[in-house]
Amino acid sequence: MLPSKKYLLIAIITLATLLLGFVFSGYLTLLLLGLDTKLFTWNTYYQYYHAIGQPQVAPFVGKIKWAGYLGFGLPLLVLLVTGLVLLLKKDKRSLHGDARFATGADLSKHGMFKKTGQSIVVGSHGGKLVRLDGQQFVILAAPTRSGKGVGVVIPNLLEYGESLVVLDIKQENFDLTSGWRASQGQEIYLFNPFAEDRRTHRWNPLSYVSDDPAFRVSDLMSIAAMLYPDGAEDQKFWVSQARNAFMAFTLYLFENWDDERSSGFPGGSGTPTLGAVYRLSSGDGSDLKKYLKALSERSFLSSNARSAFANMLSQADETFASILGTFKEPLNPWINPVLDKATSSNDFLLTDVRRKKMTIYIGIQPNKLAESRLIINLFFSQLINLNTKELPKSNPDLKYQCLLLMDEFTSIGKVEIIASAVSYMAGYNIRLLPIIQSMSQLDATYGREVSRTIITNHALQILYAPREQQDANDYSDMLGYTTVRKKNVTHAREKTHNFTEERRALMLPQELKAMGPDKEVFLYEGIPHPVKCDKIRYYKDRYFTSRLLPKVDVPMLNV
């Protein structure tokens, strides 16, 4: 029995005991006074107790009071014993489990109907929106065409009150929600580096490299690790050499820029960009090795730059060519002039997402997803890296939370920093809401152990009806088991009945697959029971449709 039910039962028994004591005291009064009990009524004791002050009743006051002591005392003693038994009695554990779905009262108790500026909308229960406040992460597992956009992505873009970065494949979310977010005082940016209409804001990942030579190398090493992630054991040499080549070319560009500024050279090459790195590494049409050797001998180069060039140029010609091939592979998209221009400067700063309210839409056409995979991965990697260096409690300017709403999370490949930083990101007020098609898809991208770590660090997990049988089996296990009593009837000489207890999944795999397009289940670590609720359909809810405003204008690149 639940504690709340125990206390309710005790309250009912207490009230009944007082009424019984009142009636019983009247009957005892007649007995102690030697009167005919046929005179007894439900309020007899009240009549005698009320007359205690009268002179003719004075000789009998003691008996009247004793009738009250006994009449109330005996039932109260029984109540006390009963109450202690109920309070001290241990719950009988069901043989196979006690899983059940949470109720609206459970959700209300945990504040999940409350709206704040940091609330993530996760579903609807009893006609009310269910939200998760605070810093905890949410993950949604939803197959394609299951309503994740209309049920989670757009509702949160139309309500979440602080900074937000969203992976917006097809750019539908920008078209529908940027107007409302702008009306709430947010700065709105669209980064679409492959925009066919050339409308995009700009982001230069190399602009975050320190001007201080003491920190520049480590900043460049961080970017190199994002562009050239660790691979299999047999790839270590090539990854290491590609990172070294990146260091050589980027240090050359930065130190050339330093030299131009210190000498007062008008115009100059400007802030280095990845497009400039690609062009520098492509040479001038002459013998590439001789060209790079000439670069390595420039007087302004630091010892770090010279060492990186020397390492690369010391390789045999065939090895050198393979190193350059590995190095240029992630940079080949920069032959596209739109991408080159979109990463040539900054219209927004990634370091501002916790300083002011802003929304960045990363808009990618589906046919460019493979081509843009690395640049999006780099974007999120750098965003997380830059915003997990200083805690909000150490800097009062970092007063806003930033939610990373990552639709098609696995489509951008393994974001290494998420795998390593997921356990401490929340402390920096960076919050995750990744959307995957299935748990097995996450396993395939991150590996089973890392994906389990990622899932474990998401306090709330939303599950839509799965399509794969293995996912249905896994979800059924996650929801737990309950005990059901089954009645058995046997017919022999006499008809007999007996009951057996059997284990049953709260939801069988086939029931999860048949959950339908309008229902969802979520598990939240703050509530011991899973929650079955309704999916949101923003277009059916005036609360959301009233916020659909014209989209924000985006400047056109001069390409």
For each predicted feature, which ranges?
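Conserved ATP-driven motor cores of ASCE-family P-loop NTPases powering translocation/secretion/packaging/pilus
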Residues: V422-Y424, Y428-V521
